[in-house]
């Protein structure tokens, strides 16, 4: 059965807006797990714009389910991951000027660097996932890199303006799931997933984990973290 990986980056974004200690993503992660999230996701960016090293250190000790660390494939980040040992690392592209991750990794262009990072992480006992667009050639390259999983970038699906466009994106995602499964890779998905568009996506099957942050945090402001997480878990469970 598919699982929810709760991304708590936006809690850290609110905290950093005032430079204080609240709200604390560590507390949000604990509440999320109590409500049914089966993993916690954080993105430690090179510019530390939201999640801080302190958050990673504490979450590594307190998360009871699975900690998924999103990060760039840099020497610094690989060293941090090998020291803190999250259960999973998801390699993602980074641009300093972007508000959020805008697209998948270009694994084809950066195959050597990504393969080197994947090997170091896996040698350290960490499961590795690559955040990629639902592109057949990128998935083939991801498999060559030695990664265990792909995380399908669902942004184009989430941004589709109408059902015909959304349906085309779903077909691409479905083909990506099938190819990854064929070559023995696990499949996760994330980016732009909300309480409406999760249903057709989850109905495809083949996705092990949905990493969702913004839509859950937006709802949590209005109804509380417990209700927001439980609502999403229910949608994933009964899609």
From Swiss-Prot:
Cellular localisation: Cytoplasm
Positions annotated to bind 1-deoxy-D-xylulose 5-phosphate: 9-10, 45, 50, 100
Active site per UniProt: 43, 70, 191
Any one GO molecular-function label of the UniProt entry: pyridoxine 5'-phosphate synthase activity
Pathway linked to the protein: Cofactor biosynthesis; pyridoxine 5'-phosphate biosynthesis; pyridoxine 5'-phosphate from D-erythrose 4-phosphate: step 5/5
Binding site for 3-amino-2-oxopropyl phosphate: 7, 18, 192, 213-214
Catalyzed reaction equations: 3-amino-2-oxopropyl phosphate + 1-deoxy-D-xylulose 5-phosphate = pyridoxine 5'-phosphate + phosphate + 2 H2O + H(+)
Site (Transition state stabilizer): 151
Gene Ontology process terms (BP): pyridoxine biosynthetic process
GO CC annotations on file: cytosol
Taxonomy, superkingdom: Bacteria
Listed EC numbers: 2.6.99.2
Family: Belongs to the PNP synthase family.
Function: Catalyzes the complicated ring closure reaction between the two acyclic compounds 1-deoxy-D-xylulose-5-phosphate (DXP) and 3-amino-2-oxopropyl phosphate (1-amino-acetone-3-phosphate or AAP) to form pyridoxine 5'-phosphate (PNP) and inorganic phosphate.
Quaternary structure and partners: Homooctamer; tetramer of dimers.
HAMAP family (UniProt xref): PdxJ (MF_00279)
Cross-referenced NCBIfam families: pdxJ (TIGR00559), PRK05265.1-3 (NF003625), PRK05265.1-5 (NF003627)
Protein name in the entry: Pyridoxine 5'-phosphate synthase
